């Protein structure tokens, strides 16, 4: 496992020369995905903090950020995609799959470009940028699905909430990474 302070921009530092190391890596990624899914499902049961559709903390994104810094881009994408799909299935919100994917993939693309350049001590900044991009991606999906730009009026509230929730999830992800044993 890589150290949290030295992110690899690609697929992490794991070399899969042995079946054991490959199995261990897959097991660790499956556990991270399960934790992300649990956080997503628990958060889905919490009443909204504000009366604005789409505003939530994004607790599952803590795990995506941790995966970026421990395993790299490719594995972070896999954890994200599996969590989004299974989260939609298990929560019974298959109609929200498009919005989750559009927000998640836009956020991922921006974070994948930026995370090698943002040190762990500023993970909160990457998380804030990612949260804002997630909200922009969801608004773009809503415009396409609804065929109107009227939903753009949600954007200011979503951007503000993205900054706040992104800062929170980034600080938590940074604290998690700081407490993991160094490899």
Predicted regions and their residues:
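Transmembrane alpha-helical segments of multi-pass membrane transport proteins and ion-pumping complexes
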Residues: 37-41, 88, 104, 108-112, ...
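Membrane-embedded alpha-helical hairpins and interfacial helices in multi-pass inner-membrane proteins
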Residues: 53, 93, 97-98, 116-183
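Generic transmembrane alpha-helix motif of multi-pass integral membrane proteins
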Residues: 59-73, 110-115
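Short helix-perturbing small/polar motifs within transmembrane alpha-helices
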Residues: 27-32, 38, 79, 100-133
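Residue-level signature of transmembrane alpha-helical entry/exit and packing/kink sites
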Residues: 21-32, 57, 61, 76, ...
């Amino acid at each position: 496992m890589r150290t949290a302070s030295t992110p690899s921009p690609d697929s992490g530092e794991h070399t899969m020369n042995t079946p054991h190391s490959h199995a261990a890596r897959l097991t660790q990624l499956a556990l991270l995905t399960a934790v992300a899914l649990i956080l997503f499902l628990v958060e889905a049961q919490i009443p909204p903090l504000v009366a604005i559709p789409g505003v939530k903390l994004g607790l599952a994104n803590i795990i995506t950020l941790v995966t970026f810094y421990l395993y790299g881009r490719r594995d972070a994408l896999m954890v994200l995609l599996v969590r989004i799909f299974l989260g939609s299935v298990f929560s019974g919100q298959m109609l929200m799959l498009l919005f989750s994917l559009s927000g998640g993939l836009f956020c991922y693309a921006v974070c994948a470009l930026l995370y090698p350049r943002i040190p762990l001590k500023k993970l909160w900044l990457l998380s804030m940028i990612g949260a804002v991009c997630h909200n922009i991606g969801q608004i773009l999906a809503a415009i396409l699905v609804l065929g109107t730009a009227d939903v753009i009026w949600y954007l200011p509230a979503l951007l503000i909430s993205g900054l706040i929730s992104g800062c929170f999830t980034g600080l938590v992800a940074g604290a998690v990474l700081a407490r993991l044993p160094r490899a």
